[in-house]
A protein has these predicted regions:
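A short, polar/acidic, helix/strand-boundary loop motif
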Residues: 45, 100-117, 301-340, 364-375
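Active-site palm subdomain of RNA-directed nucleic acid polymerases
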Residues: 11-14, 115-156, 160, 226-227, ...
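C-terminal reverse transcriptase regions that engage the nucleic-acid substrate
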Residues: 173-276, 367
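Catalytic palm subdomain of template-directed nucleic-acid polymerases
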Residues: 28-33, 44-51, 81-87, 127-166, ...
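Metal-dependent nuclease catalytic cores in nucleic-acid-processing enzymes
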Residues: 59-69, 121-126, 220, 337-356
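Two-metal-ion RNase H-like nuclease active-site motif
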Residues: 72-76, 278-287, 342
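Catalytic-core region of right-hand nucleic acid polymerases
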Residues: 1-120, 159, 186-229, 332
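Acidic, metal-ligating active-site segments
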Residues: 283, 287-309
Length: 375
């Protein structure tokens, strides 16, 4: 408390000063064992409006980084605290301790508007800065060599420092070929879930209640949204429907273990970084239970550019996704279903396929091809 008062993050509430709001303080440990102070602002969150600011998904954030680059990662220290609170808003953040009441002078963690407000401010500060991608507190810069990385990084630190943003030196990574960023392990040629998350799936215990099923879905969704929606997860998804009682039998246990192995096998090698000038293939498919797509790029010297299935490791996956069909969609005619899958794939991959000079769309329904030929 004294350290944060000295830093201008919080201040004591003067005695005999009434406040309409007063929350409780909760102390939780950080990863390194040091204490972290949190304040329970749930009641305040219920009666205040949240500023919204669009943030791309982690996959979209990392997919803009070209392959074979030197990558520098910086982590903002207490980023929320770079946003000042107006004097009239401070009393609403009052919290009680054994040593009296305190209130925030800067945006607190746990307040639902802090994240979007801070992210918007950070985005405004860094708008137009070259070769940069960000994910909340984390920033990633990329360059061709170490010398360019040095001056590029120095310029970025100066820009942020002038606006009161401070970086954590313990999490600084300079001009490395492989780094962890936005939940992905980024290598010179692609990105994949870090091994600790794959280990978390492998060691995940069998659910014993609905909360366990939700936790399982949340972990899979964090690593791979496509697999959270894949047919192999359908039996677990049914357990989450309203008024569905929880049950767990040997067949579900077998499917649970098989799904863990399948997910790990399918995503442990990650995906290849998208390169706009490579031949690109979007393959889509529809069934009564779901729709899906894969976006692949050509990494061989085969003369046949129009054949996305020439075998081996020649075409490598850049992106993939799927979802369950809705009740009405499951009753579509095949040509309608295949068109739906194609639309889903194009919309999901729009940041890759818009303006792509060498795009091939592969479907397994001849009548759909004929419609496009007629047009």
């Amino acid at each position: 408390l004294d350290a944060d008062v000295a830093l201008g993050i919080i201040e004591p509430v003067p005695q005999n000063t009434p406040t309409k709001w007063c929350a409780r303080m909760v102390i939780v440990p950080k990863k390194d064992g040091t204490p972290r102070r949190t304040v329970d602002l749930q009641n305040l969150n219920k009666v205040t409006h949240r500023e919204t600011h669009h943030t791309p998904s982690p996959f979209n954030i990392v997919s803009v980084v070209p392959p074979k680059k030197k990558k520098t990662v910086l982590d903002a220290w207490n980023g929320y605290h770079s946003v000042l609170l107006s004097p009239e808003a401070r009393n609403a953040t009052t919290f009680i301790t054994e040593w009296g009441r305190y209130r925030y002078l800067r945006a607190p963690q746990g307040f639902h508007a802090s994240s979007d407000g801070y992210t918007k401010r950070f985005d405004d500060i860094t708008a137009g800065f070259p070769r940069l991608t960000r994910c909340v507190d984390d920033s990633l810069l990329w360059d061709n060599d170490i010398a360019t990385s040095f001056w590029h990084t120095l310029s970025y630190i100066q820009l942020c420092g002038d606006s009161g943003i401070v970086f954590n030196p313990e999490k600084f990574r300079f001009a490395e070929d492989s780094v962890e960023f936005a939940g992905f392990e980024m290598t010179p040629t692609g990105y994949q879930p870090p091994q600790r998350l794959l280990k978390a799936i492998e060691d995940f215990p069998s659910p014993t209640n609905i909360t366990g099923v939700r936790s399982w879905f949340g972990l899979v969704n964090h690593i791979s949204f496509a697999f959270a929606q894949a047919p192999i997860m359908a039996p677990f998804r049914e357990l989450l429907t309203k008024r569905q009682p929880f049950y767990w039998d040997t067949s579900l246990e077998t499917l649970f273990q098989n799904s863990k192995a399948e997910i790990i096998r399918s995503i442990k090698n990650g995906v290849t970084t998208f390169e706009v000038n490579r031949p690109t293939c979007l393959a889509t498919d529809w069934s009564r239970t779901g729709i899906g797509f894969t976006l692949s790029q050509k990494h061989c010297d085969c003369p046949d550019l129009d054949n996305p299935f020439c075998g081996g490791d020649h075409w490598r996956v850049t992106y993939a996704g799927s979802r369950f069909t809705r009740n009405a969609e499951s009753r579509y005619a095949p040509i309608e279903g295949e068109a739906l899958a194609l639309l889903f794939g194009l919309e999901s991959c729009r940041m890759f396929v818009l303006g792509c000079p060498k795009l091939i769309v592969a479907v397994d329904h001849k009548p759909l091809v004929q419609i496009f030929n007629d047009r």
